[in-house]
Every structure is written in structure tokens, then in C-alpha cells.
Amino acid sequence: LVDLPAIKEFEKPVFHRFIIQHNQRDNLRDYLTKNGIQTAINYPLPLHLHEASKNLGYKKGDFPIAEKQAKKILSLPIYPELKNTEIKYIVACIKNFFDLQ
């Protein structure tokens, strides 16, 4: 349903953000917000379109894959105090979103 972060068997991640990817990112975000789940789009622009990269001369369309990915990523809640019941609620809401599609 959504693309999850890949974790290799030798890795032990310490997630700073839990970012998923989906083509209907904005619809999913709206649905989660309506259900009381805070999300974020932490990286709305690919690097080549940031103001800090302007002097490099890149323009929209130069990196189409990066631009496509920037439109798909959504950060879900992740923090040490997140309770198992809250995690289950988030998962249930995401599943319900796709059941409604």
C-alpha cells in the first residue's frame, strides 16, 4: 500500500523521522489529519530546487525522479512517548484510508 523505509539485516535504525511514500500523499495526509493524526512533509522540495542551490543553475525538470519522490513523502508520528495504542490507531487509520479507495 505504501513504501516503507528499507532496513538491511545488519542495520539497527534509530529513526529521526518515519517517512512513507505514496502517490496519494496529500489525500492520505488530509485523511489522517481529520482523524487526529499529525503528519508532516519535512522535505517538500528536492535539493536542486531549494533557494540555497539556486546558484547551481538547476531548474524544475532537471531531476524528475527527485521531484516525483518529493511529492510522495509523508512523515508519520514517531517519538519515544508514542504508545502502542496510538501506533495501532495510526496503522488502523492508514488501512482504513486504503479500504475506502
Q: PLM features: residue spans?
A:
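PLP-dependent aminotransferase class I/II
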Residues: 1-101
